[in-house]
Amino acid sequence: MPDPESVYIEPDVRIGTDTTIYPGVTLLGKTRIGNRCHIGPQVKIADADVPEGCTIEFSVIEKRKLKKGSVIGPFAFLTGDL
């Protein structure tokens, strides 16, 4: 995590190994981030399932279940299941 002071992570969030969280990220609710993901910068994820190998940049993901290896962004706003 390059700049931990610029990241907000709620207590119920789970993050896998070898995942990078970039500045300006907000992780809320029961969000699950898998292994080897790249999250941020400037991403908000709430109550979502982000499996292994996903990349998300400059986007908002709410109540969404992504597919393994998904690439999202920039400027996407996703809600509901894929």
Roles of regions detected by a PLM:
Residues 10-11, 16-17, 22-23, 28-29, ...:
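Left-handed beta-helix
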Residues 1-12:
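Long, charged amphipathic helices and adjacent flexible linkers at domain junctions
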